[in-house]
A protein has these predicted regions:
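Long, compositionally biased, glycine/small-hydrophobic-enriched stretches that function as flexible linkers
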Residues: 1-214, 369-517, 521-533, 539-543, ...
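Catalytic or ion-translocation cores adjacent to nucleophile or general acid/base/metal-coordination motifs
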Residues: 203-226, 230, 237, 242-245, ...
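Short, solvent-exposed amphipathic alpha-helical segments in soluble enzyme
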Residues: 263-265, 328-333, 413-417, 522, ...
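Residue-level detector of anion-binding/catalytic polar loops
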Residues: 268, 333, 396
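Glycine-rich beta-alpha junction loops
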Residues: 276, 318-321, 340-345, 401-407, ...
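Active-site/ligand-binding-proximal alpha/beta "capping" segment
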Residues: 313-341, 345-348
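Glycine-rich, charged/polar anion/phosphate-binding loops
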Residues: 321-324, 383-384, 514-518, 562-566
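Small-residue-enriched alpha-helical segments and adjacent helix-cap loops
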Residues: 535-565
Length: 670
């Protein structure tokens, strides 16, 4: 393969017509960059690297116009015509099954029904992109067609570096996104790098090519709400949230799961969302039952459903701060309260401040960023004040890992910090991982395992649902019972958006058992090939002190060793696709997060990889949590060591006596 032939084939012919944009499809707002003229020249040269010189004169002004109007060069002209969908794998070209499978995943991430801003390659989370521009998309797709089982495709922040010789037990694709050098690992430098075309914000499963629609977070949200009810509201383990009110904000790519998860958990929910198009998406999918722009109507509906003990998801089209004011003024009791606005990028459109409409937010981002930032800070401070008032009235508030509390701190509220000074010791309100998901799920190894049926057939998804259910013992732990019920009812709950996929929280041994069963089913011709994966938001996949590792209390919550070891270990053991990103769901410099994809083709080679990689991917996180003295992780490691004593051994801590430690420190500080 010659480079000039490859580039000529993709970009050298007659330029495709500049596309028209389908009405009703959301578009990304202008992105911040603050480039100098020299930077603009660099951005232009960087984009033109993909294009044969004969087209430079025509495309240079076009790319420059995109940079000025959008803050980024997207190369819209090179987007394929029409809508993209994750098609059945047999409809893709490729020299190996992994190359074709990755094409399914990429196109599913950019489906109009799935992606937040599909024309700008944003899958979810306001800024989470598959890659930076449509030239990269075309080149990645071409490399995936050429990829063999003796090669690995390397992708750096959306740029396909090339194909490199490897072997059958190597990853077929290795991805990294936004990994900044420490002194430049901040939002301003990232924005500049992204505008230059050298950095991509992959979020988690956007740039990791593993998004399965908002279903991917429904199970985690369901678990969080259910366990919040058990731990904070005194609900028995065999009951749900019937008769309870949950209030939150956001109905986007990830936050869109909130209403559906609350409904499955039995609750009544009111979810505020400023963008009516996102509400209509969830309403048409059946993920919210009703919508209104009236406070009184939303509350009236909620009271009716609470009295009837019926679950119901209500979308309120308006600002959550206004909604909370109304609830307080009218003495409406809220049982559970959270927020899922995109506060990892509050000043880039992720948080719409009180007092302006969604349309005004977009205009201010383009025309008056300074005013917008002031409005965001003012709104966040008041939002915090309202949460404090509801907390006094008996509401349980938790940060849903979207950097909301950090955004409040950045807006100038120092009293939100436990130490009253800075964020090093955490915040006065817990994150959902710190209080709920960490100790109840992650510490045992339960996390967001998922699979996608590459055939695109409903019968394959039905068969895998049944097989997964057979692998779960509902009497082992209450978590297993919850997971059993989840997958049993998954089809009835109509969770699929995009390709035929399923999310199912499982622990290390559960994941391996299900994975091996699926591969056996592929081998026997019972189902077509399957792509396994998980969210980066998992037991061992992410280091993030404000979210995934917020219940790590030995001081190592600020370290990123675990996520990197998890990523490297998955590469060493032969996972089909591995990804490592900066920022996750909390923002640049606040997280290092990784994930994987594993194609099940029915081979014994895949059985071997699964037997090594699946336990590692989860237990590397449980091991770190056990070393941090987390009790549930210690008991899980003891069980694992005993069950795997011929092959594995995880180091366990000796627990020091608190009185001895305090006495010793005091004596030396007299």
């Amino acid at each position: 393969m010659k480079n000039e032939d490859l580039i000529e084939r993709l970009f050298g012919g007659e330029l495709p017509p500049y596309p028209s944009f389908k009405e009703g499809i959301r578009r990304a707002p202008h992105r911040e960059s603050h480039l100098s003229e020299a930077d603009m020249e660099l951005a232009l040269k960087n984009a033109l690297r993909y294009i044969p010189k004969k087209h430079h004169e025509a495309l240079a002004p076009e790319f420059m116009r995109e940079l000025k109007e959008h803050g980024r060069i997207y190369g819209y002209r090179f987007r394929p015509e029409g809508e993209l969908h994750g098609k059945p794998i047999d409809e893709y070209e490729g020299r190996c099954i992994e190359g074709r499978a990755c094409q399914v995943m990429i196109d599913n991430n950019l489906d109009f029904d799935v992606a937040l801003y599909p024309y700008e390659l944003v899958t979810y989370g306001e800024t989470g992109q598959v890659c930076q521009n449509w030239m990269q998309y075309r080149l990645i797709k071409e490399y995936l067609k050429e990829l063999t089982q003796e090669q690995t495709l390397v992708v750096e922040s959306g740029h396909p570096l090339g194909l490199f010789r490897s072997h059958k037990f190597s990853p077929r694709v290795i991805i990294s996104n936004g990994l900044m050098v420490g002194m430049f690992d901040n939002q301003a430098d990232f924005n500049r790098a992204a505008a230059l075309g050298v950095a991509n914000y992959g979020q988690m499963t956007a740039g990791g090519w593993m998004y399965i629609g908002p279903q991917g977070i429904v199970h985690g949200t369901f678990n969080t709400l259910l366990n919040a009810g058990r731990l904070k509201l005194g609900i028995p383990q065999n009951e749900d949230l019937t008769g309870r009110l949950f209030v939150s904000a956001g109905l986007g790519g990830m936050s869109g799961a909130q209403g559906k998860a609350a409904e499955i958990a039995g609750a009544v929910s009111i979810i505020a969302e400023v963008d009516i198009s996102r509400i209509m998406t969830r309403y048409e999918q059946g993920w919210v039952n009703r919508y209104t722009d009236s406070f009184a109507q939303a509350v009236e509906w909620a009271k009716e459903e609470l009295a009837a003990k019926r679950p119901c998801a209500i979308a309120y089209n308006g600002n959550v701060v206004d909604l909370l004011e109304y609830l307080i003024e009218n003495n409406v009791h809220v049982d559970l309260l959270s927020d899922q606005t995109s506060c990892h990028v509050p000043y880039d459109g992720g948080y719409c401040p009180q007092g302006i409409t969604f349309e005004e937010r977009t205009r201010l981002l383009d025309e008056d960023k300074e005013t917008f930032v002031k409005l965001v800070n003012k709104s966040l401070v008041h939002h915090y004040e309202l949460i404090c008032e509801l907390d006094k009235r008996g509401t349980y508030f938790f940060d849903y890992g979207n950097s909301f509390l950090k955004a409040v701190y950045d807006a100038g509220v120092k009293e939100i910090c436990k130490n009253g000074v800075d964020e090093k010791d955490g915040f006065i309100f817990p994150s959902y991982v710190e209080d709920i998901l960490g100790p109840q799920l992650f510490d045992y190894g339960y996390g967001p395992f998922r699979w996608l049926c590459l055939s695109g057939k409903q019968e394959d998804l039905d068969a895998t649902d049944r097989a997964a259910m057979e692998c779960i013992d509902p009497n082992r732990r209450y978590q297993d019972r919850d997971n059993y019920v989840w997958v049993r009812d998954a089809k009835k709950n109509k969770l699929v958006v995009g390709t035929k996929a399923r999310i199912l929280y499982q622990d290390a041994m559960g994941r391996m058992k299900i994975a091996l069963k699926f591969n056996e089913m592929v081998r026997n011709g019972e189902i077509g090939p399957v792509m396994l994966g998980r969210d980066h938001h998992d037991t061992g996949g992410t280091d993030s002190p404000f979210r995934e590792t917020s219940n790590i209390k030995d001081g190592s919550n600020i370290m990123a060793d675990m996520a990197i070891q998890c990523y490297a270990g998955n590469a060493a053991r032969g996972m089909s696709l591995i990804a490592l990103h900066n920022g996750g769901g909390v923002g640049i410099g606040k997280s290092i997060n990784g994930g994987f994809g594993m194609v099940l083709d029915g081979s014994e080679r895949v059985d071997t990889i699964l037997s090594m990689a699946m336990p590692w991917d989860t237990m590397c996180g449980v091991a770190r949590r056990a070393w941090a003295r987390n009790e549930n992780s210690i008991s899980t490691v003891i069980e694992y060591n005993e069950a795997n004593k011929l092959t594995d051994h995880i180091t366990l801590p000796n627990i020091a006596c608190d009185e001895l430690v305090k006495k010793t420190v005091k004596e030396f500080n007299k």
